[in-house]
Structure formats: structure tokens, C-alpha cells
Amino acid sequence: IDLTAIAQYVRFQHLLGVRTFFEDIQLLSPGSILIYDLTSGSCDTRAYWSFNEIPYAPTISFDEAVEESARLLDRAIKRRSKDDYAPGLFLSGGLDSRTILGIIDRRPIPTLTYGLQNCRDVYYAKKIAKAAGSDHHWFDLPNGNWVLENIDLHLDLTEGYHSWIHAHGISTLSSARQLMDVNLTGWGGGMVMGKRFIEPRLYSAVDDAALTTHFFYKFNQKYTWPAITEAEERLHYQQPLNDRLRGLAYDSFREELEPYMDFRHDVKSEYFYLRNHEWRLTLNFVNFTRSHVEVRVPYYDYDLFDFMHSLPAEFRMQQRIFRPVMQKMIPKLTKIPYEYDEFLPTTNTYVRSTHATMVKLKRRFNRHVWEIFPEYFTLYADYQNYLRDELREWAEHILYDRRTAEREIFEPSFLKTLMKRHLSRMEDATIGKIAPLITYEMMLRRFYD
């Protein structure tokens, strides 16, 4: 068992780089070829592509960048949807999937949305589907039973690298297989076109130490559910592992980040995020979807990716370039709010600011006067309450099981503390501290024992 992997999984809820859960086994690096020589019996890897090959275009104007990115995105989507296979789309209330739906030529195509009935994704996806004329299907996630029904499949397909609190969508795959041959996924849209996480403290950090400490905090607390903190880590492991694991996640994070410090200053954090969050965590959504349908990824079109990352990072921060592209290509869909903040993704400043003001006023009225305006859940799957209700017995059976304690990894008394905190409802987000531990134990039972 790789001890660094334990430390990383507990602090980030995924692993970094090419690391696996087991020593002397690693993933093939992205952009690499593995070569096995039959004569000598030697094995080697060779990189065929690097981020260094992306040119820098600091002199291009913003308007030129919008025009070219719109052209490349249009071509990327149409390249992947013009054959004889039936395309379909998982549609959320975000920007990435609606942009694909708005640009694709074939009509109507099936769209699928999963989530709680009164969540933002379900509400806005329905509006987007109606505006775009898609054949829309909604799948409810009213309780945690779907997790129990699909947990073994999810573990098999993701090998434990993806905790069960990221299994949403897997319960829809049998239906998706009947509706589409090819899923045109919006995965990577925010990464390529401009993610919210692009911020000055990352793309223009004052020095490497400032970047490292802030980035570690983001990976630990912000990019997914908040995970175990430094103080909690001191109570988390049994001895003698406690002394060996304490601080190991941070040390390995620094080591993994070090090679990226040589890349262009405004994009090196994005490249690290791509390889260590997108590839190691969110790509698992694509992986388990591929168990039922082919998945095509328009946003990771080579030409589009290279062009977008040749631009100054400021062009892509806060969807600065994405919204003009949408306004140019799918203006009708910019009139439907973005689920993240419920503001319009339009470039019309007056319309956007007026609408945003109304949204804020309604929220304040609901909060301070009288709750009369509808508000929608931000989460499509209520994993927190699943764990308190339908999943509680299952989770406690794993966490408190003799086999779990006898591994001498996690401190049994602290596992009970975490679960008590979660059940008390006194804290907003404790599930990111518990779910990875359950998944890790399940992984050991399936692949190690």
C-alpha cells in the first residue's frame, strides 16, 4: 500500500500525478507512449507532447481571440457530431453543455438531466432544452437508494479513485444507452474556455511559495467538498502511521507542483489543475459513462485547447471570453440564467446587471422579509442527507467494521467523531471528510484483500 496515496486521498479526495494506491504501480503519463522491447525485455516511456509546445500569443486582441475561439469551438463540436451515430447530451444549467446543444446542427437530439426536482440544474436545464428544442429527459435523485444500487458498479469502473459522492449520473446510463450512441460531453468546457478558478492569486502569484500554499488550500478545501484539515489529520491515523503520514500530503503536493513552476507564469497553475484535478478526479465521469456509450469531448479538441491556452490567462478568467462566444453563437441561450449564480451569461451589461440586481433583491426579501420568491437547491444530489438517512447503516457498517480497524490505518475513535459531527447537522460540509474513507476501505476489500 502506498502511504503517500493514503495521505493524498484523505486531503484531496483524489490522487496526484501518476500515483496509484499501490507502490511500484503507476499510470501512464498523459501525452506519452509506452514502448516494450521484446528482444531486451526493457520497458520505457516517451513523451510525444508537452504543454511547452503551446505557443504564446500576447499580442492578439480580445476581439480577435473571441472570433477565433468561436470558430474553433464551432468546428470542434461539428467534427464530433456529423457522422451516422446518434448524438446525445447530458444537460445541466451550466454553460458548457448548453453551448454544445446550441451549436450542434442536428435537431432534435436527446438531452438528459439528473437531480433533485427543485434544484437549479433541473430547473434551468428544462428551460435550455425547451429553448433549443431538444428531446429532454429528467431523472430524479430523491433519495440515496440509487447510490446503493450503483455503488459496486461505480467502484469497479473507477477503481476507487473516484469517491461515491461523485457517482451522480451513473444511475441514468442504461436509459442513456437507449437514447444515444454518442455522448457529446461538456466535460472540460470550463477548463478550456475559462474556469471560475482562474484568479490573480494563481496566475500572478507573488512567488512560488505563495502559489503553493494557496493552491494546496484550494485542492484541500475548495475544488470539491472540504476535506480533512491539518488539525484533523493529527487525529486521523493510528500509530505508528500517524507520524509517517502527517504532513505527507503537503510535501507530495509541493513535489508534484515543482515541475510546473517552469511553465509560463499565468498558465502553470491551470496545467497543474488539469493534470491533477481534471485528469485524476473529474475524468472519472467520462470513464464510467464510457461503460455504456461512446463519449466525445469537443472542448479538448487539440486546436481549440492550444489556441485558448496560447492566450493571456486574463482573457479567460471569469468566463470573460466564453460569454462573448456564447453571445455570438447562441444568443438565445444567454437569456437563461447560469445555475452557479443565477445571473444571465449575456454580454449586454445593462441586461445582465439589471437581472442580477433583481435576483439579489429577491434573495434579500426572502431572507429578511417574507419567503415568497422561489429558490432552487444548488446541489443536484443531496449526498449529505443521503448519508444521514438511507446510507447511514451501510456507511457505519464499513467505518466501524473490525476489518477497517484491524488495518491499523484510520483511528476508530476519530471515525466515530466524524460521523457524529455529520449526523449532528451542526456543520455545513463534513461529507468530504467521511466519504473518501468509505471508498478507500471498499477499494482495499475489492482490489487488495
Can you describe what each PLM-predicted range is?
Residues 44-46, 122, 192-194, 307-308, ...:
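Short helix/loop capping segments that flank catalytic or ligand/cofactor-binding pockets
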Residues 41, 188-190, 445:
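Short, glycine-/Ser/Thr-/acidic-enriched flexible segments
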